[in-house]
A protein has these predicted regions:
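Eukaryotic scaffold repeat domains enriched in small/polar residues
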Residues: 1-272
Length: 272
């Protein structure tokens, strides 16, 4: 085990899960992960985007490795157990082209965003396709590049609508509830947002990719705080992507252009 101490906090690295592979317990360009419900707590769902080539190019139609893997991590590297694989490459219902986000609701139902098909595909916990909803557009309940996805304790769904520069809130059946954001640099506007997470108080954190910050909102979309500013220094961000919140309320941000993870307190103070 590798231990790192930063800002008085201890971070223990245990082991890696997976390897480069187009099937089985390995992954091909993994981009998102979600844990199962309490009844399925040992499992994780991992999205592989495959070779990340441009769709509709004849030599890439198979898009080797695109899929969702349900895996039970072992206690050490190499002991992973593959439960199932599902949602491979394609345009038919139940298939994906550019999967981007994954989330699991309270009943164990799995939701996958597809930023190419502009839809959300829904599966049971074993990967059986149930339905899909969403379509291309700029109106309510329509998408242009859905990416990050979050499900709250009431099973309402928040989807980062990247190229529409907004967050949409919907029911688990896809019925539209609310929208916030819009293209801009103001404190409640977004530019190509990507990741999304929530804390135990219900606040929602969105990585505002091209504004080089993470914004904090109430569950109804009211602005609460902003983390980071453009740059390479401590507490500065370059095109942040993923975001997560731990049980203590600390916010972990994937600082994409700076090739690092930074940690902030819930009020936006830089930690490490």
């Amino acid at each position: 085990m590798q231990t790192q101490i930063a800002a008085g906090r201890v971070f223990d690295f245990s082991h890696a899960v997976g390897r480069s592979a187009a099937s089985g317990t390995g992954f091909r360009h993994p981009c998102a992960v979600a844990t199962g419900t309490e009844a399925d707590a040992d499992a994780v769902y991992v999205i592989s985007r495959g070779f990340e080539m441009i769709p509709n190019v004849h030599w890439n139609r198979t898009a080797l490795g695109v899929r969702v893997s349900k895996v039970i991590p072992g206690l050490v590297s190499g002991e992973e157990e593959l439960v199932t694989e599902f949602s491979t490459y394609g345009e038919d219902p139940g298939k994906v082209i550019w999967p981007a986000g994954v989330a699991v609701d309270s009943q164990g139902t799995v939701y996958i965003t597809d930023e190419w098909m502009n839809r959300i595909s829904v599966f049971d916990s074993e990967g059986k396709f149930l339905k899909c909803w969403g379509e291309s557009g700029t109106g309510d309940g329509k998408f242009d590049g859905p990416s990050g996805i979050l499900i709250d304790p009431q099973d309402d769904i928040y989807i980062v609508d990247t190229r529409n520069h907004r967050v949409q809130k919907l029911t688990k059946d896809g019925a539209y509830l609310a929208t916030w954001g819009g293209l801009g640099r103001a404190k409640d506007q977004l530019d190509s947002p990507w990741g999304i997470a929530s804390d135990s108080d219900g606040y929602i954190y969105v990585s505002d990719h091209m504004n080089h910050r993470v914004q904090k909102f109430t569950p109804t979309g009211e602005f609460a705080a902003s983390f980071g500013s453009p740059g390479t220094g401590r507490g500065e961000l370059g095109r942040p992507s993923g975001v997560a919140v731990d049980p203590e309320g600390d916010v972990y941000i994937c600082d994409w252009s700076n090739n690092r993870v930074q940690v902030f307190a819930a009020d936006g103070r830089f930690v490490t």
